[in-house]
From Swiss-Prot:
It is found in: Cytoplasm. PROSITE patterns: AA_TRNA_LIGASE_II (PS50862). It comes from the Bacteria. It catalyses: tRNA(His) + L-histidine + ATP = L-histidyl-tRNA(His) + AMP + diphosphate + H(+). Pfam families: HGTP_anticodon, tRNA-synt_His. Its main location: cytoplasm. It comes from Bordetella pertussis (strain Tohama I / ATCC BAA-589 / NCTC 13251). InterPro entries: aa-tRNA-synth_II, aa-tRNA-synth_II/BPL/LPL, Anticodon-bd, Anticodon-bd_dom_sf, His-tRNA-ligase, HisRS-like_core, HisRS/HisZ, HisRS_anticodon. Belongs to the class-II aminoacyl-tRNA synthetase family. Homodimer. This is Histidine--tRNA ligase.
Length: 428
């Protein structure tokens, strides 16, 4: 007896993108890539799998990502610990060091692709999701920090988004954070009675992250904690003031959020998030900041750097709420045909039209004209090319507008096959 195969579904939190939504993804990526090119950013592609120690070192041992959220396994061939990337910055920095990219000049680079985190799936939070990761490697001043924020404001405008807000903070330099850390630990020790289990566990290993709590019982304690901003030295304040001045020059409003720390340990000086109220609890659309010590931490020479990451699923959700996105057609031209000779001719004509730069579907199989026209209309094609018995005999094609022109311009016309491509292209 043959055993019935149990149907396989996608892993929870890892979603399929089907042809309709995929077309919107392609349109979205087209806008994003054009926007990035306009600022001089070039594409890089790094592996989905990296050595686990890259993320443990780069992101931080005592972070939610490293402690709880990474997909990690042991390579059966050599025993290496490997991890599916939970973010892209560490991999891009690793690549820049390995390939000596930073030897003689800075680089503006970006990557678009999937990342993986073992989280509880919900709207805006998935186990496989996609990021747009943008990095400026080798740039030290607040001018590049400001440019990144300004370019994001431009993207929101390109996408027609109105209600995305900027939150800003400075994490200073290591010595300033050390002084703040000591004061913060004292504060946490005085309020141990309100700390939850996670807060008590992190009190000494990562006290700054204790303030980034969603626990209502800890909010008053977090609000009264020493502010890192008060520990900043002259150079850090100057960098932040320079950033704020440039944002004012660009007319970009922001809210200073002293509790904004981000979930990755490599940040220093500038950190920022763009947030919205329209995505529920997962309201952060984009986050980033400066990470001047990461290249050296991962074995490279001291190199200033700044970057950000955008969650594509969240931004797509927001975009689709904000504007009406037209469903792209499957093709420009749909060829219908009659008889075996018509079908064979249609295949040749389809290739000729593609040579001319047109997107063409040739109806597959044999069917009556009514069924073929129904499928042609469903494809979204502007024009149907008809190769019936008369057309095959006279080496012509009939052109029928399915959508677009009206009146005389929409009348069906018959043209010689040799002129078909030119006539179709003239119809836009």
């Amino acid at each position: 007896m043959t055993q019935v195969f149990q149907k396989v579904s996608a892993i929870r939190g890892m979603n399929d993108v089907l042809p309709g939504p995929s077309a919107r993804w392609e349109k979205f990526e087209e806008i994003v890539r054009g926007w990035l090119r306009s600022y001089g950013y070039r594409n890089v592609r790094t592996p989905v799998l990296e050595h686990t120690r890259l993320f443990a070192r780069g992101i931080g041992e005592v972070t939610d990502i490293v402690e709880k959220e990474m997909y990690t396994f042991t390579d059966a061939l050599n025993g290496d610990s490997l991890t599916m990337r939970p973010e892209m910055t560490a991999g891009i920095v690793r690549a820049s060091i390995e390939h000596n990219m930073l030897y003689d000049r800075p680089h503006r680079v970006y990557a678009i692709g999937p990342v993986f985190r073992h989280e509880r799936p919900q709207r805006g939070r998935y186990r496989q999701f996609h990021q747009i990761d943008v990095e400026a490697l080798g740039f030290a001043g607040p001018d590049v920090d400001a440019e990144m924020i300004v370019m994001l404001a431009r993207l929101w405008k390109l996408l027609g988004l109105q209600d995305v807000r900027l939150e800003l903070n400075s994490l200073g330099q290591p010595a300033e954070r050390a002084a703040h850390r000591a004061a913060l630990i004292e504060h946490l020790e005085r309020h141990q009675d309100v700390l939850d289990e996670d807060g008590r566990r992190r009190m000494y290993s990562n006290p700054l992250r204790v303030l980034d709590t969603k626990n209502p019982a800890m909010q008053e304690m977090a609000d009264s904690a020493p502010r890192l901003f008060d520990f900043l030295g002259e150079a850090s304040r100057s960098h932040f003031d320079g950033l704020c001045q440039r944002l004012a020059d660009a007319g970009i409003e922001y809210r200073l959020n002293p509790r904004l720390v981000r979930g990755l340990d490599y940040y220093n000086l500038t950190v920022f998030e763009w947030v919205t109220d329209r995505l529920g609890a997962q309201g952060t659309v984009c986050g980033g900041g400066r990470y001047d010590g990461l290249v050296e931490l991962l074995g490279g020479k001291p190199t200033p750097a700044v970057g950000f990451a955008i969650g594509m699923e969240r931004l797509l959700d927001l975009w689709e709420q904000s504007v009406e996105i037209e469903q792209p057609a499957e093709c420009e031209v749909y060829i219908v045909h009659q008889g075996e000779e018509g079908q064979r001719l249609a295949a040749r004509v389809g290739e000729q039209l593609r040579d001319a730069g047109l997107d063409v579907i040739v109806h597959a199989g044999a069917a009556g004209f009514k069924a073929q026209f129904k499928r042609a209309d469903a494809s979204g094609a502007r024009i149907a090319v008809i190769l019936g018995g008369d057309e095959v005999a006279s080496r012509t094609a009939s052109i029928k507008h399915l959508r677009g022109p009206v009146g005389a311009d929409a009348a069906q016309q018959q043209v010689p096959l040799a002129q078909l491509a030119d006539v179709l292209k003239s119809k836009g």
